[in-house]
């Protein structure tokens, strides 16, 4: 069986802190959990850069996973750094949808996304939500949930909320997929909504 983040002792320590420690240590551990998970799937050795955004939403922390877009034949100088994934770490006592609304208002002007699309991950305590951000959509329609497709009473649904301890294999699969593909490839080759 393939190893996941749950096999690493640091994640057990972070989970324990989030469940049992008083504030402000819980907040620090929530931010650390989001950052550590991203660093595991987007390592610097593969050309990824994880930075904290200057733009913050509703008291949460916004992280940007970026990569260089090369320009010219020499391939030496990056034209710009594109946002491949945006992550929002929201304290479990806060409403994460408020942070999403604020991000939606800021995103069209501020994010440097490639081809108008990128991944979005929201960490809310021990829950994680996965989205695709579509820059050219109207306000309120820029984020589409992505995850596991299922059917109920003949209707199709997308499950995009997962628990970091119980849904380890699914989260691992989604994070690995996000690390290896841009959103535009995902939209063309999967069950999710059109780009």
Q: Predicted segments — roles?
A:
Residues 124:
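Charged, structured surface patches that assemble and position nucleic-acid processing machinery
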Residues 1-119, 127-130, 134-195:
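A short, conserved, highly charged catalytic patch centered on acidic carboxylates
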């Amino acid at each position: 069986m393939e190893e996941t983040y749950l096999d690493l002792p640091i994640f057990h320590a972070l989970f324990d802190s989030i469940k049992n420690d008083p504030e402000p240590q819980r907040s620090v551990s929530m931010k650390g959990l989001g950052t550590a998970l991203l660093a595991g799937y987007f390592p610097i050795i593969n050309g990824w850069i994880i930075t904290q955004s200057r733009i913050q939403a509703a008291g949460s922390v916004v992280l940007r996973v970026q990569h260089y877009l090369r320009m010219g034949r020499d391939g030496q100088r990056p034209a710009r750094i594109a946002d491949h994934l945006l992550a929002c770490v929201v304290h479990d006592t806060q409403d994460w949808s408020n942070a999403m609304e604020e991000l939606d208002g800021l995103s069209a002007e501020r994010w440097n996304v490639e081809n108008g699309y990128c991944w979005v991950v929201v960490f809310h305590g021990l829950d994680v939500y996965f989205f695709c951000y579509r820059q050219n959509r109207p306000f309120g329609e820029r984020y589409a949930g992505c995850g596991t497709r299922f059917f109920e009473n003949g209707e199709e649904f997308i499950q995009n909320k997962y628990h970091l301890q119980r849904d380890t294999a699914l989260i691992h699969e989604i994070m690995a997929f996000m690390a290896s593909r841009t959103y535009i490839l995902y939209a063309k080759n999967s069950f999710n909504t059109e780009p």
